[in-house]
């Protein structure tokens, strides 16, 4: 567990100055941070699903508000794991670059399809964006992606 804390907080790879340590530190315990991540991520997905259900309501603004709120909450949930500044720095690292781009791309495509194109296409983009967001979030937990890959490999064989 200590190794996981060090990897997520960057203590084993970074030499931090006093000011950056104060700015990036968190007073939350490790278990509270994990619980905060799980709760925020689940609430974000719930808001996104509610927004998706509101896609077929004639007022498209409801869809946009709930879906946007859900995605911001889900992406923000990873800030519990390492802090906001470090997360923003790590969003575009090679290990999660594709997932970050896909999340942002599907978010834009979902809103464009809801307002300009087809609601069915918007639903497909909602599903794809949720999958990309999950993959992005798993990149912050060491070996979580490998575990998911192995689980799916076992299920598919």
UniProtKB/Swiss-Prot annotation:
Residues 1-36, 83-96, 142-157 are cytoplasmic. The modification N-acetylmethionine is found at residue 1. It comes from the Eukaryota. It is a multi-pass membrane protein. The modification Phosphoserine is found at residue 9. Coiled coil: none annotated. GO terms for biological process: protein transport; vesicle-mediated transport. The keyword Membrane applies. InterPro entries: Vesicle_transpt_Got1/SFT2, Vesicle_transpt_SFT2. Residues 58-61, 118-120 are lumenal. The keyword Cell inner membrane does not apply. GO terms for cellular component: cytoplasm; endomembrane system; intracellular membrane-bounded organelle; membrane. May be involved in fusion of retrograde transport vesicles derived from an endocytic compartment with the Golgi complex. Belongs to the SFT2 family. This is Vesicle transport protein SFT2B.
